[in-house]
């Protein structure tokens, strides 16, 4: 921190500076090109913003003729991004943010400031704010679980012009030049403070802001701190605590899989310039600490405003937002989501629900969108998918159309959608309504699984087991053989037991599913289906999308949590037997399994029983396979599991295999698999082994910064 504050933010390039001729070529081209279209369309916004910036000493204005005289100068364009903010009373207002696009490539070098940055130079402060939303939700659920009868209160503190509080080094300023029209004259502007668009800026700002969060948490835990006597000068602006009606019951929290430390005085977290605070309402002292800690921490670290300053300065704390967001309450907007700590829900605010729904409805009516509109829509839906992860399965077609619109030599004035995309957009309308009505925090956290499914597949059949010893298997009809590649069959197999339990009524609201399989591709597709494996062709991809959409619809409609995990094939014995041993009738297969367990000297022998695959699922599987052409390259000679004493097979299970079959904890701590996450990506077994060094092993393979804030980051 001392280096950053003393020397300013520096741009360190991995391959050094550009050659002088190339730099000058980039600079001249940038000055001729000017700013992005979004900035040109909002000249008044640019002028208003930069007059304020110049008056506060954040930008240094120069005449255009000075641009080529500055040593090492480089220029990047401005843009304007529209977003929502709140006014002093908490009302939603549209706000334009000026963006300094340091990712824009130079005309000659084909390099941008951001692309040249040496990533190794950014390691001085880890960026943990990306998981702040997840940590807050985990903390709220853990607090309710520990204090089931207590209200949970929250508030939010904001920095005023956060990035403008840290200065750039002189060289970085020369490399952060832009241009704008101010008072009817063109000026060259040197950025003297952190820019909105610089790759380095979040790292250097977090070097300053993360210790402030640490300080706020230290204040909460400090027994000698009396917030009534030591507090921010703006504390009197914080409104009184607001409670939701008692008619709304306190929602119960489900038990977590991970250990989240809960302090009786609450916790503060941080996302760049936002500092949300949450804690239990246990006494007046608890409330007063919760209401003051983050504001005092920001005040302590900021220099007092003085009339002697050469440039007008504002308080580090955004006092204008205190009335709207500073007071303790049970309903608070954090990162664009409405947290209801009483009902334990996260929901899409009404203004976003209306705007986003209108955008989708217009696209459905016209069956088309402008490329810029589609890009905005994808960003919005991806934001929504942060709490409805399974909805990402329905983004792939939209992304495909947007990527097509960017192909070289193709300029699309409008993008026209086919029936499949229109179907996806109609589903997104349902998802938007669901998000607006609220998603339970209990399905947004890492929880102990309530249902465990193990599955396997071969070229001739699918099979698996439930945790109570129930078995299932499905033989691929003869005329549908040799169509699907094995990864797709494995994926279909992982869908079946979930669907069976939904139809059977065995899954309850907010249940947590752990789906286990020995295909890394299929395990990854359970949560992310827009990537393509080497053996896939177009019909394969369409079939995979059909399966993934069916899976996502089940999970979303039933409000379930789905985790998927790879397991070693040697431990996946029962599903392997169910999928391969078609020479055995159901009763013979069950007797064989019972005999194998008996011969393994197991104290607990499962009560095996076979459950038939429902007709609805059978018809779906057949319809998927019927759409695939036969492929001679996918012909495989039938092969049994080898666990059949009647044909000189193995007559018992190994102890480790028996343990793996019925112990999910054994699987979660398995050294070959350190990923239990909704965003898990498929990878080869060798990669999994390479990434399982003891020094990197965390509980159940879940990154700890997803559920608890690291201490003393800087």
Predicted regions, residues:
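Amphipathic alpha-helical
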Residues: 40, 50-56, 402-442
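Catalytic-core region of right-hand nucleic acid polymerases
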Residues: 41, 45-50, 54-220, 347-397, ...
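Catalytic palm subdomain of template-directed nucleic-acid polymerases
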Residues: 107-119, 165-168, 233-307, 341-346, ...
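Metal-dependent nuclease catalytic cores in nucleic-acid-processing enzymes
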Residues: 135-145, 210-214, 488-510, 546-557
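A short, polar/acidic, helix/strand-boundary loop motif
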Residues: 185-210, 246-250, 362, 467-492, ...
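C-terminal functional segments of enzyme domains
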Residues: 333, 338-344, 558-617
